[in-house]
Structures are given as structure tokens and as C-alpha cells.
């Protein structure tokens, strides 16, 4: 799931086409992950990064093949507390991720096959990216059609 998170973050932040959207995987920096794990506990490695980096209007996405990864559940709880939109990608029956009130949307892949779950998470992630790109393009087109605005109000 860590590799899938890095791939999804890369798709948003460095797309082959379309607009880049700021995104990063909280598992990508081994030094931060191991320092937090050793100093405060591995169940807090992602929530501490949410505290440090999140801003209002951000989106937190967590990927877990079981849906029961404590470190991700704690991070999603922290993200929700901070006002972020929270999205879970889970497998099997969805685990605690699918029933948590701190998860706004949970995409559950009902399979016992880890590789099928991860393949499906990749497809759902790509579709999510596609929707963001479509909406962004439409918003830009709408703004362009509206023409320039006059913020000062004078003619």
C-alpha cells in the first residue's frame, strides 16, 4: 500500500498530462517514518505528519488492503479533526476504515486477494485523478468564458 500511495501521489503531483495538484505520500520519507516510529510509535507516523503539514481544504487519502491499519485509522481521525476531507481505500470487508465516522468516503474492494485489491485501488485512484482533472479543466474553461473580472469595481 505504501508503494501504491507513492504512485497515487505522483499521479496527482507530476501527471503526464493535465494540471499538477500538490500531493505527497506520507510514507515516502524513510527518515521521517523511522524517526517518528522510533520516537513516538509507529501507530503515529502518519498522524504526526498530518498535524505538521495539513491545511484546511486538504484531502487525506489512506490505502489499506485490510482496512484495519491502526496507523492509517489514527491519521484519518486526526485529519478529520482538522477539517480535511478523508478518503479510505480498503480491501476485504473494509475493516474499521469502512465503518469509521472519521472517513468521509471509503472505497472497499471486496476480495481476499491482496494483489487484486491493490490493482483495484490503483484503478480507483486513477479514476479519482481523472475526475479531478475533468473538474479542473471545466472550472478553468468556465473562468475563461466569464472573461476578465474588474476587482476594483471601476470602469
Give a label for each model feature.
Residues 140-155:
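A short, charged, Gly/Pro-tolerant segment at domain boundaries
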Residues 1-143:
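Glycine-rich phosphate-binding loops that contact phosphosugars or nucleotide phosphates
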